[in-house]
Amino acid sequence: MSGSFWKFGQDYSIESPVSKILNSAFIKINKDQDDDVPTGTCEENIADDEDNSSHDYAASEDNVVNENEEKEEENTLPTTESEYENYRPNLDVLDDLLDDDELYTELMCSNFKLLIFLKYPEVLSKLIEYVTNEKILDEETDSAKKPEIIEGVNDHPILIERDRKDKKEDAEEGGDSEETTNDSDHDSGDERSVDSEETSITLPPESEEQVETRRARIAAEILSADVWPISAAIMQNKDLLGRLWSILDHPAPLPIPASTYFMKINERLLDMDITGMLEFILSRDSLVARFLTHVDNPSLMDFLLKVISTDKPDSPTGVIKILKSQELIPKLLDHLNPEYGISTQSAAGDFIKAFVTLSTNSSNELASGIGPNELTRQLVSEEMIEKLIKIMLKGGTSLSNGVGIIIELIRKNNSDYDFIQLVYTTLESHPPTDRDPIHLIHLVKLFAKHMPDFADMLDKTKLPLMEMPFGNIEPLGFERFKICELIAELLHCSNMTLLNEPNGEMIAQERDIERAKELETSTEKENITFIVDNKSSYYDKDCVEKDITENLGALQINNQGSEEDELNDTGVSSVKLDVKSDAKVVEGLENDASGVELYDETLSDTESVRECLREKPLVGDRLKIALEDTKILISILDMFTEFPWNNFLHNVIFDIAQQIFNGPLKTGYNRFLLKDYLVDAYLTKKIVDADKACQDYEKKTGLRYGYMGHLTLVAEEISKFKEYIDEMKLTFCNTAVSDRLEEPFWKEYSETILADTREKYNTVLGDFGNDQESDDDVIRNSDSEDIIGDTEGNENYGNGENDELLSNGHDSGNMDLYYNFNNNENEENEEDYAEYSDVDNKNYYNNVETNDDDYDSDDGKSKSAESEFTDKISEHRDGNSLYNEDNDENGSDKWTSGTSLFPPDHFPSRSQPSDPKLQDQNIFHHQFDFEGVGDDDDYMDPNDDGQSYARPGNPLYTTPKTPPRPKTILFNSLSALDNNGEDEEVALGTSVDDRMDNEISSDEEDSEDEDEENDMGNEEGYSLYRSRSKEAF
């Protein structure tokens, strides 16, 4: 036992250290004060008596007293939970329990006394005190600080010794042995000293801070353990939860260990009792402010996201209403300002993006999503978007985080993927709710308004040159890249169907007004059981009223007295009428402008159409108009060649170009962006010049510019666009676009450079084209010529009976049977294989041949697959040719010569047809005749499932009767491979294997006896004899 790694004793009756500690962990309430003295006091009294007696007597007396007390305490402790009501916990043993390594293991093993002890409120309070200790909360990342080391500690190693029980057992065993000599004692002492040296390690003593940190970690593990009694005991004492949540009141930054403990414990309680936990959380004052104090703490913000995720559409919990009433979204946007640190800005932006992802509008995006809600609706409101844009225009990290939020909003709330399209709904059929999909009308309109500001930022941003191995270049910079990315995403958003519907904005505004009224009514009537302090409103009505006032301009709001929370019905009605009338005007203008080209092949891109669209633009067209006015798309396109090594920028520019060339041509303002790209920006000329510049640069440096891949993609988009308008026979009223596409230099580039590049892109990777034919191709061509040559002298060719046969005889399946022969031989040489013998032999497995490559070729006993193949060809070249003229005279025998592709011991024969007349039919005629295909082979397949029986007239299960096999192994048709076969016959004819001759002769004798039996069976029409395995063929 001394050298074993097992630290537990073999005696299962021995108590664990935790159980021993728990024996003194309970104090009976009705006991006298003397009996209530803890174990530590008794030990002190015993220690005082040691001064008046000898050390040995005192030590033995102490052991006896402790053992008696432990036995007595063990016998007196109750065995049921109800009986522990008369006991109180002994908190003095809690530190000993936390210091024991087996505490958590005992807890997960449901130690009864341990669970009873930990359920006491006093014990739980002590554990929470460990977690919320000021030393833990004030812990700084000062890992460089070393604990104070007592002098002389490092001079003496600390020995990790065996358990005291093991030492005691070893001592008892040593006492029982009477024949032990002094030498043996000396040897055992040396062995123990060696063990001590091997297991010794020098460790500095733990400081007080380290001890408290370790105990806090164990306390957090206990409180967050998946043990229902402990979690239930915590939930029954709200004061304990209040002390735990006091961690949030600690000033930032909060140490990561403390926040991790907080998250683990609360997540466990939330999973166990979601109703009780949410009731407690929502009753906290200033919940949002307390969390945002630690916004850069990932553990706390992750827990807040989990709390939000409990408010689902089918089971609302009121969390979203509370967070909105406490202005979560505005306060988060405030943290994006440059006044805060970069880490705080990034943390706030990441939280908003995670919340948008959680509230995605796509039903199949996240199974645990909560869908659109009032928080995301507030985020895309006019006030919040205006606030976000102003923060983004400050540049730096604020711009980067803002662009990320906008991109996430657009991608997760695409109205084209709504289950029910908004334009096909009415207030009666689909009454608005707080879970309706959100629209991005305000977002697009406000970014169109501030587009000149972003264009100025894009043009004015300049960065110092950066030194690179190939020269000094100007870096693009994060701000310019983010603006380009923002423009591409806004262009995606402007193509949404809702934003290009004449009535889309009107319908959305109507639903917003109705939703505000309904939420106001429900707020007055609803009584949420979770909320204790509801002084603040659940819905920010002032924000909604401001949006409606600014957008519609006709809504009268009464902000006095009791009418503060009500909307003026008369104002709403007038607003609806005005919006409807405006929508009719817009629709009429659109029809007037584009009604001609709806069913016409001429695309109206005249100035009159442009002015009509600009006068009353739709939401999507408003953004495109802003892009055209600011010329920001052309500026971004010019950056393509200005930053030839930034592939991120090139990908964004290609995305923009792809949207423009694939956008609508007959409706909307996209056709004018297309004109700007091709005419004003002269995109075709830019592509040709960029390609020429790359060629010149390659000649000088041997390098190609990094934009060439995306340059080809943009050129392909133009090429596809030209093919589309040619195929659809579309023409532009303004011929400038067509003229650009018909210019000679562009045609030359498209037909030469672009075509060659397209061909290279479409080539299979690694397929460079083989100039020389392979050996297999030569064999295939020879066989094909052989068949064609034989058919010229075939009398039966062309009579209709054999035409189909010859056309199908040279199929890929039969030819591959031969072409893969060499490969099969090589595969068989790579591993051992077993040959099957005839049934007459008692042994199914004749012999096992090892790999020929394992032996030396000089022994003469083994040959390679290639030499055998050559010998077999040479021996039987003059045997029976596949297309012999003699065989042509007798059509029925032409395809039934007894040749075989494989040696007879490897593969079985196939069964004869049930009807002898079927033998002459072409369906059974194969290009290659196989040796041993007749019924004379009695091979039994051990893998046969017993279900493959011959069926009459079925070509898949029957084969024609074949005559006895001649002495040939391989195809007779291989004579066509070489016209000078006679010269090779003399050289190769004498190299036939003797073993093959013996096997063939024995097979011929067996075939004569079995042919008569098979013929008798075939005379009756069909038989149920089992067919041979077809897997070999």
Curated annotation (Swiss-Prot):
Enumerate the UniProt keywords alphabetically.
Answer: Cell cycle, Cytoplasm, Phosphoprotein
Where are the stretches annotated Disordered? 32-82, 147-213, 768-813, 828-1033
Biased composition (Acidic residues) is annotated at 171-182, 784-793, 828-838, 932-944, 1000-1018
Which positions, given as ranges, span the membrane?
none
| Compartment(s) where it occurs, according to its Swiss-Prot or TrEMBL record | Cytoplasm
Question: Which GO molecular-function terms appear in the entry?
Answer: protein phosphatase binding; protein phosphatase regulator activity
Phosphoprotein keyword on record: yes
Post-translationally, this protein is described as follows, namely:
Hyperphosphorylated in the absence of SIT4.
Compositionally biased region (Polar residues): 909-924
Q: Which residues carry this modification: Phosphothreonine?
A: T990
Q: Name one GO cellular component term.
A: nucleus
Q: Give residues where Phosphoserine occurs.
A: S774, S857, S862, S892, S991
Tell me its family: Belongs to the SAPS family.
Quaternary state and partners of this protein? Answer: Associates with the SIT4 protein phosphatase catalytic subunit in a cell-cycle-dependent manner.
PANTHER family xref list: FIERY MOUNTAIN, ISOFORM D, SIT4 YEAST -ASSOCIATING PROTEIN-RELATED
What name does UniProt use for this protein? SIT4-associating protein SAP190
What is the scientific name of the source organism?
Answer: Saccharomyces cerevisiae (strain AWRI1631)
